[in-house]
């Protein structure tokens, strides 16, 4: 009995302390913070983020409380931005104040203690690695030079689909494999031997790292940190990734060159690592973190966008016919198809824009406000976590007519770009932290999609109609399809 009473006293004392701390933190906030829903003691608004994808649930909050709204996630005061004006102020006008990233348990473990580029803090390391990325690795010139790799892998994919003519195929699986091979040849200089292992590692780690952890939301609690079992699973996943990358990097050191003796991404990073003029030394973990960036952001997002575009086109046969007519007329008689040819395909590029609007590869962009700032009249305290809801902005009826409808023709009237200038459409972000692999990612979307539309007439499996296509998203950093896309390829015969 005495033991039971002691436990009750301890629990009541701990809860009382946490409630007092909660009130103390709330009292320190400025008066003019963004509005938000009524919150519960201790957990804040966590109860409002159950039973759906975060971008969907947060959209519901901003629709009710305004495009700039605060959410209390445990101990963490966070602000959601869901309008073009708010995004413009945070990513352009006040960009230095919002250029930092917050990290959580998943990103810290899987992205090598933020020594990569995606989750790096806004510091000299980030500036240096971004400069290397933009000038040495993924510049538009280098992206064009990778054209022969895209052509090789697409030729293999086309042969595979031709051999399966008239039969249902798992398009999701085959496109993921192809994009993975393209990325690995660019990054490593050759195709990865255990490609399926790498794909599974990336997909599973992205799934595990993308959710909310109680230990992240209550950072002052050593007990929750100790009991965060997903953290231990992530460390095991990290060990598997380390083992894979260490082995491959060692092979690369011995080989010393990529395909045909050319310099690949790892060669460039090793060269920079030996450069004594580097302001911040590049570590082995930094190299592995960058490679993981390339695969996690380059493979999953490009494949997901191709699949969303195909899914939408299958739901709208008239759009599919228009896209195929343009591709087949423009590419008729050409043996090599790459960026030069694809850049002339206006409607195809509108299809890609529309797929990115409805299904952005990064539905929410995380930022950290490093000093007190004012956004659309509201005060954002320093160290506030910022969530820019790109998915919600892309479906806002204030900016888009029939926002939930797939309509590539809308860009004939308002030709918005996707490189961070038009804040109605920012699938790759904007400002200093815009995705440095933007051109590489677009090339790996537009070129494969053009070839798939050129070579095949796509049909649904027997018994399915356009209304039966499952468009459900699943949890993940890239907003992928929940279920694989199964289609039937029919070889296009230009003379028939």
Swiss-Prot record:
Annotated membrane topology is: Single-pass type II membrane protein
Looking up InterPro entries in the UniProt record yields:
CYP450_71D, Cyt_P450, Cyt_P450_CS, Cyt_P450_E_grp-I, Cyt_P450_sf
For activity, the cofactor(s) needed are: heme
Task: Report the transmembrane regions from the record.
Answer: 1-21
The way this protein is applied in practice is: The monoterpenic phenol thymol is widely used as a fragrance and a flavoring ingredient in food and cosmetic industries. Its derivatives have also several biological and pharmacological properties such as antimicrobial, antioxidant, anticarcinogenesis, anti-inflammatory and antispasmodic activities. Medical applications include the treatment of disorders affecting the respiratory, nervous, and cardiovascular systems. It may also act as a growth enhancer and immunomodulator.
Q: Which GO terms describe its biological process?
A: terpenoid biosynthetic process
Q: Which UniProt keywords apply?
A: Heme, Iron, Membrane, Metal-binding, Monooxygenase, Oxidoreductase, Signal-anchor, Transmembrane, Transmembrane helix
Residues recorded as binding heme, renumbered to this chain, are: 435
Q: What class of enzyme is it?
A: oxidoreductase
Pathway field: Secondary metabolite biosynthesis; terpenoid biosynthesis
Q: According to the UniProt entry, what is the EC number of this protein? A: 1.14.14.-
Cellular compartments annotated: Membrane
Question: Impact of changing residue 175 to V on the protein?
Answer: In strain: cv. Tc
Which cellular components does GO assign to this protein?
membrane
Q: Where mainly found?
A: membrane
Under Gene Ontology molecular function, one entry of this record is: monooxygenase activity
The protein's role, per its UniProt record: Involved in the biosynthesis of phenolic monoterpenes natural products thymol and carvacrol which have a broad range of biological activities acting as antimicrobial compounds, insecticides, antioxidants and pharmaceutical agents. Catalyzes probably the C3-hydroxylation of gamma-terpinene to produce thymol.
Q: Which family does it belong to?
A: Belongs to the cytochrome P450 family.
What's this protein's name? Cytochrome P450 71D179
Instruction: Record the organism.
Output: Thymus vulgaris (Thyme)
Q: Which gene encodes it?
A: CYP71D179
């Amino acid at each position: 009995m005495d033991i039971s009473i002691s436990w009750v006293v301890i629990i009541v004392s701990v809860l009382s302390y946490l409630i007092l701390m909660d009130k103390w933190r709330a009292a320190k906030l400025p008066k003019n913070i963004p509005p938000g829903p009524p919150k519960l003691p201790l957990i804040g608004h966590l109860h409002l983020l159950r039973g759906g994808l975060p971008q969907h649930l947060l959209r519901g909050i901003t629709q009710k409380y305004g495009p700039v709204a605060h959410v209390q996630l445990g101990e963490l005061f966070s602000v959601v931005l869901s309008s073009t004006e708010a995004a413009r102020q945070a990513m352009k006008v006040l960009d230095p104040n919002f250029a930092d990233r917050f990290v959580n348990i998943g990103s810290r473990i899987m992205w090598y203690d933020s020594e990569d580029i995606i989750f790096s803090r806004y510091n000299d390391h980030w500036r240096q690695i971004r400069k290397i990325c933009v000038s040495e690795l993924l510049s538009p010139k280098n992206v064009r030079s990778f054209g022969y790799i895209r052509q090789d892998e697409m030729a293999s994919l086309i042969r595979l689909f031709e051999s399966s003519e008239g039969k249902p195929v798992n398009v999701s699986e085959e496109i993921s494999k192809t994009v993975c091979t393209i990325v690995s040849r660019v990054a490593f200089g050759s195709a990865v031997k255990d490609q399926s292992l790498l794909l599974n590692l990336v997909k599973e780690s992205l799934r595990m790292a993308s959710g909310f952890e109680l230990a992240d939301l209550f950072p002052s609690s050593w007990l929750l940190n100790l009991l965060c079992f997903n953290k231990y699973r992530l460390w095991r996943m990290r060990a598997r990734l380390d083992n894979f990358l260490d082995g491959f990097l060692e092979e690369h050191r011995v080989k010393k060159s990529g395909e045909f003796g050319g310099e690949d991404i790892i060669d460039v990073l090793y060269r920079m690592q030996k450069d004594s003029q580097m302001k911040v030394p590049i570590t082995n973990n930094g190299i592995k973190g960058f490679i993981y960036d390339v695969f996690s952001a380059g493979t999953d997002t490009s494949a997901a966008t191709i699949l969303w575009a195909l899914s939408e086109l299958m739901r709208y046969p008239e759009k599919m016919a228009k896209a195929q007519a343009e591709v087949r007329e423009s590419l008729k008689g050409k043996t090599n198809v790459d960026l030069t040819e694809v850049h002339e395909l206006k409607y195809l590029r509108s299809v890609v824009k529309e797929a990115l609007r409805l299904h952005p590869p990064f539905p929410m962009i995380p930022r950290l406000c490093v000093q007190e700032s004012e956004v659309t009249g509201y005060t954002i305290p320093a160290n506030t976590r910022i969530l820019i809801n790109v998915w919600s902005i892309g479906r806002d009826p204030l900016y888009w007519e029939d926002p939930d409808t797939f309509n590539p023709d809308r860009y004939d009237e308002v030709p918005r770009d996707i490189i961070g200038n038009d804040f109605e459409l920012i699938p790759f972000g904007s400002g200093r932290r815009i995705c440095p692999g933007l051109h590489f990612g677009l090339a790996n979307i537009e070129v494969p999609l053009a070839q798939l539309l050129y070579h095949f007439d796509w049909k649904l499996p027997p018994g399915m109609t356009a209304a039966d296509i499952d468009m459900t998203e699943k949890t993940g950093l890239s907003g992928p399809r929940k279920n694989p896309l199964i289609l039937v390829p029919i070889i296009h015969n230009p003379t028939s």
